[in-house]
Structures are given as structure tokens and as C-alpha cells.
């Protein structure tokens, strides 16, 4: 009967949760918001890639009239952010991770006194955080901090800006 088939499929799906899951897909929110995918390459190493839109207040350094000027501004960015991570399982489903990666995408400089300027964005970042993997459900929750450096390039104005690029984020992912 249909009930037996559904029950059997449900039992198989739940039993799959008892084996090691190497893939996680979900959402990341905070300093940027979007989709997150994590692939365990071995017991302790993973690649995590986020495709996200972010908004942040940052400091920007630029060269004006032969002197270095530091200013603060708002950035709206759309990036892909792959990271290589070392994962260490602690106890009771809690794990810690650290690593680094890069970000590539577009950034929109938003300033009250000027029109928005679009930049190509290229950066490097560190990543440190902790997570919790549920024992009975195929879900993980994580918090992380990603300090970094970004170059913002604008061809029209022949400008290169340097920015402190940071994100604090929370994520939830489905494991499979």
C-alpha cells in the first residue's frame, strides 16, 4: 500500500542521517545574505562557497593629489566567496573551523553626497567560527567572522580603492 511505501522511504531517509554527510546546502545571513554550500573533502578539511549580497559600512583608502586619504562609506556587494576550511569536531555535535578564501564580484559604493559608483571587487579573507550539527536531524547551524581586504576597481574613473572587508554571519544548512 501507499502508506507502507511512504513509511519505508521515510525510514530510509532517516537512517541516511546516521551516516557521515559530506555535503551541506543552506542559507547565510548577517554581513551578507545568500546561499551557502559546504563540501567535506576529508574528515577535517572542507570547501565552503557562499553566493551572497551584502551591505556594510567600511573604511576605504585612496590616493588623492599624491596623499593617502582614508574615508568611510557604505558598500553594497554581490559576491561569490569560496573558502578552504579546517574543521575540528569538539563534543556533542559542536565543531570549530578556521581558514580563508577569496571574494570576487561587484560592489556599489553608496555615499550621500555622490552618485553610486560600481566597482569590480576582488579580495582575500580569513574565516573563523563554530557550528552545531544536530544529532537527530540533518541540519547544521554556524556562526562565523570573516575579516578581509578588498580591492575595488573602477575602469571609468581609473580608480583602485582598498577596503577593509568584513562580515559576521550565521548560517543554517541541510546535510546530505
Short names for language-model regions:
Residues 22-36, 74-75, 92, 152-163:
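Solvent-exposed loop/turn segments connecting transmembrane beta-strands
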Residues 39-143:
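Gram-negative (and chloroplast) outer-membrane scaffold detector with strong preference
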Residues 1-5:
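Positively charged n-region of N-terminal signal peptides that target proteins for export
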Residues 7, 32, 42-44:
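A generic structural motif
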Residues 6, 16-22:
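Sec/Tat signal peptide C-region and signal peptidase I cleavage site
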Residues 30-32, 52-54, 101-105, 144-150, ...:
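Outer-membrane beta-barrel pore domains and translocons
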Residues 12-13:
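Repetitive helical segments and hydrophobic/amphipathic motifs
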Residues 164-176:
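Outer-membrane beta-barrel "beta-signal"
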Amino acid at each position: 500500500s501507499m502508506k507502507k511505501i511512504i513509511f519505508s522511504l521515510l525510514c530510509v531517509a532517516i537512517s541516511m542521517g546516521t551516516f557521515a554527510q559530506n555535503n551541506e546546502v543552506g542559507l547565510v545571513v548577517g554581513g551578507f545574505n545568500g546561499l551557502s554550500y559546504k563540501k567535506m573533502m576529508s574528515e577535517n578539511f572542507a570547501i565552503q562557497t557562499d553566493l551572497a549580497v551584502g551591505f556594510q559600512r567600511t573604511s576605504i583608502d585612496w590616493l588623492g593629489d599624491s596623499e593617502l586619504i582614508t574615508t568611510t562609506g557604505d558598500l553594497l556587494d554581490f559576491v561569490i566567496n569560496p573558502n578552504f576550511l579546517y574543521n575540528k569536531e569538539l563534543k556533542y555535535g559542536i565543531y570549530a573551523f578556521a581558514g580563508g578564501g577569496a571574494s570576487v564580484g561587484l560592489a556599489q559604493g553608496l555615499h550621500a553626497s555622490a552618485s553610486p559608483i560600481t566597482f569590480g571587487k576582488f579580495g582575500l579573507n580569513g574565516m573563523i567560527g563554530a557550528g552545531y550539527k544536530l544529532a537527530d536531524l540533518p541540519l547544521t547551524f554556524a556562526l562565523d567572522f570573516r575579516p578581509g581586504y578588498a580591492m575595488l576597481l573602477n575602469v571609468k574613473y581609473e580608480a583602485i580603492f582598498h577596503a577593509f572587508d568584513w562580515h559576521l554571519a550565521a548560517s543554517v544548512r541541510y546535510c546530505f
